[in-house]
């Protein structure tokens, strides 16, 4: 079984490596999103160092990210699924918003064009393991590592 400290360290490491995109205030919108005066927001990249915020990425959510007033973090899990991912990408683009997409390795392998679209649109892409087993807490460490690494090490989109 995976100990909770392994899960916390793994999640913290992933957050550190990925950074997060944060939806900000409309004040900076004009410079970041020309031609969309009525768009909802803009984005900034927020890199979270787990040494400074060790609780980020844990299941308990006892600590939040260092956000400004009216900021939220948008994340989407378990894609890319062409039907839904394309709709979400259009909505985000229409409003000049960036997000983080945690994709499943098997979905990425089946839909590499979807991953390319996420990256080309400027979104952050992270892993949600190879096939998103719901039994991580009861899985032997070597199998969990294979799941995590399989989601990370798939073919790079070109």
Regions from the PLM with identified roles:
Residues 12-24:
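Bacterial N-terminal signal peptides
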